[in-house]
From Swiss-Prot:
Keyword Cytoplasm: yes
Role according to the record: Catalyzes the methyl esterification of L-isoaspartyl residues in peptides and proteins that result from spontaneous decomposition of normal L-aspartyl and L-asparaginyl residues. It plays a role in the repair and/or degradation of damaged proteins.
Organism: Burkholderia mallei (strain ATCC 23344)
One record GO biological process: protein modification process
PROSITE patterns, per database record: PCMT (PS01279)
Compartment annotation: Cytoplasm
Protein name, UniProt field: Protein-L-isoaspartate O-methyltransferase
Length: 322
């Protein structure tokens, strides 16, 4: 090598060769790194589960169990204790709502049972109603179907109940008494009722007479009576919307006429439509004064006999239609 080259390269080529790195060193480094990682994992596992919360097991909808698992990284903050208590309360309310129809259903079943009506019939019998046809009719007709649902619990009490439009459904004792007086043990072919109301008395009459004609002057009550009677499928009732004081001359004569409203007297038109031997039952008197249940019998073409019986109270008998 020349002197100039020796100055530029003071080391010989042999001196520039490096010994190759032994592979054992690289493997040892990897092993050390792995040991350190395992130590970190072991330490993390030993720490309480605050960094990795565990979701408690919960029941599956069909009885299985969901396994506990770590919560996801993004998770909403846990609900406050008060919120945790509110959820069961909501479920309890839902349960109460679902249970309410069962309670109402049980009450309805008890209300509509034959035993309830039989107790009403026993009271009627004890109060003097003796006609077995009338008692059977009162037992068969479900009175609760003719009153508002809010009054259904009182349906079989001996009380007059409002049906709207300043009208009432008569007491069971009064209904039975009037029908028994009108029938008087006879087989009734044709009966006229003045004042259909909700249709209850017409339904009872339909089980005593062959044909029942009923007139109502208040249009909404006339429509309501049709709806009330429809589920019973009563084939022998003919409802009419009109003035009850006029009667139904086209269908006369009638074996019996029952008037469910009080007038100062019995309209002459109704007396004329009563068959000879027929009986008319009506309350007579002022609304603010004394009213008396009155029996009128037609004994001849131009002769009627009147009997004054029980003190009663009815809504007034009015003319015209509304």
């Amino acid at each position: 090598m020349s002197g100039e080259r020796a100055k530029r390269f003071p080391l010989a080529l042999e001196d520039l060769k490096r010994e190759p790195r032994k592979p054992e060193g690289r493997v040892a480094e990897r092993q050390a790194a792995g040991d350190a990682a395992r130590q970190r994992l072991t330490a993390a596992a030993a720490v309480p589960a605050a960094a990795s919360p565990i979701v408690p097991e919960r029941r599956a909808p069909h009885g299985g169990v969901f396994a506990a698992k770590p919560a996801r990284a993004k998770q909403h903050a846990p609900a406050a204790p008060g919120a945790a208590k509110r959820a069961p309360q909501g479920g309890a309310k839902q349960g109460d709502r679902s249970a309410a129809p069962n309670v109402a259903l049980s009450g309805a079943l008890a209300l509509t049972s034959e035993r309830v009506r039989e107790r009403m019939v026993e009271r009627l019998r004890a109060n003097g109603v003796a006609d077995p046809r009338v008692l059977a009719a009162m037992s068969a007709v479900p009175r609760h179907m003719f009153v508002d649902p809010g009054l259904a619990a009182q349906a079989y009490e001996d009380a007059a109940l409002p049906i709207g439009h300043q009208q009432t459904i008569s007491k069971p004792s009064v209904v039975a008494r009037m029908i028994e007086l009108a029938a008087a043990g006879r087989a009734l072919e044709r009966v006229l009722e003045i004042g259909t109301g909700c249709g209850y008395q017409a339904a009872v009459l339909s089980r005593v007479a062959r044909d029942v004609y009923s007139i109502e002057r208040v249009r909404p009550l006339y429509e309501r009576a049709k709806l009330n009677l429809r589920p019973l499928r009563v084939p022998n009732i003919r409802l009419h919307y009109g003035d009850g004081r006029v009667g139904l001359p086209a269908a006369a004569p009638f074996d019996a006429i029952v008037i469910a409203a009080a007038g100062l007297d019995v309209p002459r038109a109704l007396l004329e439509q009563l068959a000879i031997g027929g009986r008319l039952v009506a309350p007579v008197g002022e609304q603010a004064g004394e009213q008396v249940l009155t029996l009128v019998e037609r004994v001849a073409p131009a002769q009627w006999r009147e009997s004054r019986l029980d003190r009663v109270f009815f809504v007034p008998l009015k003319s015209g239609v509304i």
